[in-house]
Amino acid sequence: MIFAKGHGTENDFVVLPDLDAALSLTPSAVAALCDRRRGLGADGVLRVTRAGAARAAGVFDRLPDGVSAGDWYMDYRNADGSIAQMCGNGVRVFAHYLRASGLESADEFVVGSLAGPRPVVLHGFDPARATTAEVTVEMGKANQFGAGSAVVGGRSFDGLAVDVGNPHLACVGITADDLAALDVAAPVSFDPALFPDGVNVEVLTASVDGAVSMRVHERGVGETRSCGTGTVAATVAALAHDGADTGTLRVRIPGGEVTVTVTESTSYLRGPSVLVARGELDPHWWHAVAG
């Protein structure tokens, strides 16, 4: 049972090539795999398969809107084993893995997800330097759906609710010094009526010279070094804070920097991907943790 390990701005993933979608990704198996002491350690798991194979295996009952049976499909699981609709950093790593492993020969193709199709572009990919890549993902339209508040690190923040294929509350206005000192790892509280399935919470500075700084508490994970969909939500909120609906911002997260462009009809996330390891999981260990 082979695997790869990669990260997008230090949001790290275990990649499991499983073209027939035959693996039993139980919550207990995913949680063990992502545990940094008893497994490989990661913020999530990316199963590499085709959408048609995932449907046939019962991963979902019907193809997500806009996704074809022949499309690559990113079956993404959070570190606690729960299923997530979308992960922007994960799509970059997923696309990079496909190209670096030879499963995909084109530099532009579509990655399917529960949130729908995500077109990707690998910029100047060099097979001789396949461990690194620069990838743009078309993330779709980011939709605002209200205002809310959250308590993070003992402080209350007002924010903008944004749907990027998954729910976010992006809270603009903290100073850079206060952001650095904020305890984002602690559990957060939020309005369950607005976010019945939980929410990813971003706390960020207002934009200065075309850039913001952000930290994120991801549902099912806790604080991560980066969150791709979160950077899109943060950009939408920062632009709205400045009275704009569209624009481009650089978003600085603890794991690095990405560039997000928001248009009237869609959004784009561009950033790095790094593949750091390949290996083989012990089948006896896997069967033991899969339950």
Curated annotation (Swiss-Prot):
The gene is dapF. One of its GO terms (biological process) is lysine biosynthetic process via diaminopimelate. It is found in: Cytoplasm. It catalyses: (2S,6S)-2,6-diaminopimelate = meso-2,6-diaminopimelate. One of its GO terms (cellular component) is cytosol. It is an enzyme of class 5 (isomerase). Pathway: Amino-acid biosynthesis; L-lysine biosynthesis via DAP pathway; DL-2,6-diaminopimelate from LL-2,6-diaminopimelate: step 1/1. It comes from Mycolicibacterium smegmatis (strain ATCC 700084 / mc(2)155). Its EC number is 5.1.1.7. This is Diaminopimelate epimerase. Homodimer. It comes from the Bacteria.
